[in-house]
């Protein structure tokens, strides 16, 4: 009589999750040196097998062009030899970061003589659901391995060939370094059914992190039974206060909007105090025009745009709620700082908001009242980034309040546990 394995009745996604859970248990106690050796092996393998990766990526790019995909999306999808080498360099940067696992968060000797320590431990199995950029495959795997986690990767169908090749290289390197290869897996299947199954793998997958557009994130948050860390969209604001330095305000505005408009920390709305609007807006509109930005203006901004060279269209309600990720920005004049805050509270995604002001009182009030992951004073919204904050690489930028908020580095990929050490202590 043939004895069936429990795996025989499982779907491929569930099997992968069980393998990841077993791998996570093996990873958790490993010392930093062994994890770093695996990461160095990954970096070397990426460089050695660059041609294999680029060839696989070319299939995705060709398919995207045939489907009429925009050049902006194709650029994010494309891997060149230079980009693969840059990804390998990023992995080596992760090696240099401190290992958070085992860090004592707090500890003390209790009055009864018990030694109590709270220490960082891996989350376990991390699922990443993401869109077109295949570099996320390697970034996520490197950060999860460094923090002692197994990772289940579900990229978009548009990058299937690229992700398959990358994960093959990653698994070979990890296994060759003596770590469990199942610590890095691509979720089987290209259909949405595999995504739904991953989202319902509670008990096997410890956390899901979606990275992508608003629709993807909303779907994961609403449908997942696995706990989710929401890396929200970036409807970021720049508020120019009545007491702003105008030269500084123009520089911050243009950098926030136009340096790299397709990322989540670019500014999507400009708010200008009415007392400075007549002096500031003509300059700002011309600068935005020079940067190629279209302005979606309220009626008060439109009044200052008549003699401007800017491309200006009338704003609708939808504009205040839009993450453009393009050379577009919404703009409004507000009566006061408090009205700016009210606008932000109504429309912001909770990512990053900036104030430009020379008034310490205004800056203090703005930072106290605005409830976003990052509030910048006289600085661009573009600084909300793990690398810019000195955290090294990041898994995403969380816009929720539980577990992690803001750029998520290695410590945010850990939880904690308490270690209680006694000498025959019993509770009476």
Curated annotation (Swiss-Prot):
Entry's Gene Ontology BP terms: L-proline biosynthetic process
Enzyme Commission code(s) on record: 1.2.1.41
Pathway(s) where this gene product acts: Amino-acid biosynthesis; L-proline biosynthesis; L-glutamate 5-semialdehyde from L-glutamate: step 2/2
Disulfide bridge positions per record: none
Keywords: Amino-acid biosynthesis, Cytoplasm, NADP, Oxidoreductase, Proline biosynthesis
Subcellular location: Cytoplasm
Molecular function GO terms recorded: glutamate-5-semialdehyde dehydrogenase activity; NADP binding
UniProt catalytic activity: L-glutamate 5-semialdehyde + phosphate + NADP(+) = L-glutamyl 5-phosphate + NADPH + H(+)
PROSITE patterns: PROA
Pfam families: Aldedh
Enzyme class: oxidoreductase
GO cellular component: cytoplasm
The keyword Iron is annotated on this UniProt entry: no
Protein's UniProt keywords contain Ligase: no
Sequence similarity: Belongs to the gamma-glutamyl phosphate reductase family.
HAMAP family in UniProt: ProA (MF_00412)
Known function: Catalyzes the NADPH-dependent reduction of L-glutamate 5-phosphate into L-glutamate 5-semialdehyde and phosphate. The product spontaneously undergoes cyclization to form 1-pyrroline-5-carboxylate.
The name this protein goes by in its record: Gamma-glutamyl phosphate reductase
């Amino acid at each position: 009589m043939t004895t069936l394995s429990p795996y025989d009745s499982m779907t491929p996604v569930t099997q992968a999750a069980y393998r990841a859970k077993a791998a996570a248990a093996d990873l958790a106690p490993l010392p930093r040196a062994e994890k770093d050796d695996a990461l160095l092996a990954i970096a070397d393998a990426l460089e050695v097998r660059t041609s294999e990766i680029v060839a696989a990526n070319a299939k995705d790019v060709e398919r995207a062009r045939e489907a009429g995909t925009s050049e902006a999306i194709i650029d994010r999808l494309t891997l060149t030899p230079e980009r693969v080498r840059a990804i390998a360099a990023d992995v080596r940067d992760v090696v240099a970061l401190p290992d958070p696992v085992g860090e004592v968060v707090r500890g003390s000797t209790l009055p009864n003589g018990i030694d109590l320590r709270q220490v960082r431990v891996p989350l376990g199995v991390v699922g990443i659901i993401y869109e077109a950029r295949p570099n996320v495959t390697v970034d996520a795997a490197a950060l999860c391995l460094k923090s002692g986690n197994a990772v289940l990767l579900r990229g978009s169908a548009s990058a299937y060939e690229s992700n398959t090749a990358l994960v093959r290289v990653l698994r070979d390197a990890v296994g060759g370094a003596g770590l469990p290869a199942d610590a890095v897996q691509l979720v089987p299947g290209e259909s949405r059914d595999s995504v739904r199954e991953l989202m319902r793998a509670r008990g096997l997958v410890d956390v899901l992190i979606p990275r992508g557009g608003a629709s993807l994130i909303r779907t994961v948050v609403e449908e997942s039974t696995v706990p989710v860390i929401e890396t929200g969209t970036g409807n970021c604001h720049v508020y120019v206060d009545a007491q702003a330095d105008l030269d500084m305000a123009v520089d911050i505005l243009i950098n926030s909007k136009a340096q790299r408009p397709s990322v989540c920390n670019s500014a999507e709305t400009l708010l200008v105090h009415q007392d400075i609007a007549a002096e500031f807006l003509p300059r700002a509109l011309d600068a935005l025009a020079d940067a190629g930005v279209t302005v979606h203006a309220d009626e008060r901004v439109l009044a200052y745009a008549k003699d401007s060279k800017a491309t200006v269209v009338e704003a609708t309600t939808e504009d205040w709620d839009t993450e453009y990720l393009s050379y577009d920005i919404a703009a409004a004049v507000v009566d006061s700082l408090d009205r700016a805050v009210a606008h932000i509270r109504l429309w912001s995604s909770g990512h990053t908001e900036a104030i430009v002001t020379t008034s310490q009182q205004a800056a203090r009030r703005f930072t106290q009242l605005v409830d976003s992951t990052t509030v910048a004073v006289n600085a661009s919204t573009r600084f909300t980034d793990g690398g810019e904050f000195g955290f090294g690489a990041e898994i995403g930028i969380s816009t929720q309040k539980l577990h992690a908020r803001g750029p998520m580095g290695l410590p945010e990929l850990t939880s904690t546990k308490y270690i209680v050490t006694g000498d025959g202590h019993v509770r009476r």
